[in-house]
Amino acid sequence: DTGREVRIICKTKIAIVVTTPMVARVFLAHQINTLVEFYNVTIIVNLNGNRSMLDNISNKVNIINLPIERHISLFADLRALFLLISIFYKNEFSLVHSVSPKAGLLTSIAAWVARVPSRLHTFTGQVWMTKKGVGRWFLKLLDKIIVTLNTNILVDSFSQQDFLIKEGVLSKDISIVLGSGSISGVDVNRFRPSKIRRNLIRKQLNIKDNCVI
């Protein structure tokens, strides 16, 4: 006993559930890499042999491979659901966040069953928007279940939020659009015009600086 106080910091545990690694790579990598500096982050995803797709994700992030199918498959979906419930019970996450319809449905049910305190889903589009008849009604019902079982709902645009409200899927008081709307924001450094290149092109084309193009 050295007499020194030993402090063990237990980070809050967060799980992010997506159907494919492409979603995490393209839309969520920046958020995940930021979150992992403050929280214990786990990605639950169907890798399907594409582990390299997550090479832009911090190695501090835990990755669990789960066979979630994008399309409806009763037996595969039930298996994924029970596996999710088991994972949630075992890890005792404080928050789970799902993106994409299938991941959203299975995660919301599993997290509700496992009594995860905070359950968040992000709507990025509706597979039923162009459907008609019973198929449209059924798929819309699944989105309503997602809304009912989650404690928080994010929508990636105001137009989509208005559409979902109009269709009776959710209400404005239980859904949030961050900022001006976007699933992952815009990298302003990447899309910032280059003044050097601008001046070079204007010089090559003999265009004066005060000319509006």
Say what each PLM segment does.
Residues 26-27, 75-82, 117-118, 127-149:
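Nucleotide-sugar donor phosphate/pyrophosphate-binding loop at the beta->alpha transition
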Residues 16-76, 163, 168, 174-176:
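N-terminal strand-loop element at the rim of the active site
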Residues 64-65, 144-198, 207:
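Donor nucleotide-sugar binding/catalytic pocket of nucleotide-sugar-dependent glycosyltransferases
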Residues 13-18, 111-127, 143, 154, ...:
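Active-site proximal beta-strand in glycosyltransferases
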Residues 98-104:
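Short His-centered aromatic/hydrophobic patch
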Residues 4-12, 56, 192-213:
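Nucleotide-sugar donor-binding and catalytic loop/hinge architecture
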Residues 45, 98, 154-158:
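Short beta-strand scaffold positions
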Residues 87-94, 207-208:
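Glycine-rich phosphate-binding loop signature in dinucleotide/nucleotide-binding domains
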